[in-house]
């Protein structure tokens, strides 16, 4: 599956335990997203457009109104990266 660099960075942060917090307007449409890694730092590559592409490809999912997490399809699509921890 073709995954762009910003999508790849976002998926990698989610695969390590991060989440995507979302904010809705009065009509229920998602208007703003913030991607956090497992340490609580904000990832700037995660924009509303990246969020929409990941959601349309079903690489992320949310259940019961909780923050978005990586799905099993997302785990298979993410390429391994070196972790400099």
Curated annotation (Swiss-Prot):
Pfam families: YjhX_toxin. It comes from the Bacteria. Coiled coil: none annotated. NCBIfam families: PRK13687.1 (NF010240). Belongs to the UPF0386 family. This is UPF0386 protein PSPA7_4799. It comes from Pseudomonas paraeruginosa (strain DSM 24068 / PA7).
């Amino acid at each position: 599956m073709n995954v762009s660099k910003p999508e790849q960075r976002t998926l990698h942060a989610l695969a390590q335990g991060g989440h995507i917090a979302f904010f809705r307007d009065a009509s229920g449409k998602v208007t703003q997203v913030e991607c956090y890694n497992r340490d609580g730092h904000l990832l700037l590559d995660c924009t509303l457009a990246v969020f929409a592409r990941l959601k349309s490809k079903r690489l992320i999912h949310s259940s019961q109104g909780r923050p978005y997490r990586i799905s099993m399809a997302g785990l298979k699509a993410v390429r391994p990266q070196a972790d400099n921890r």
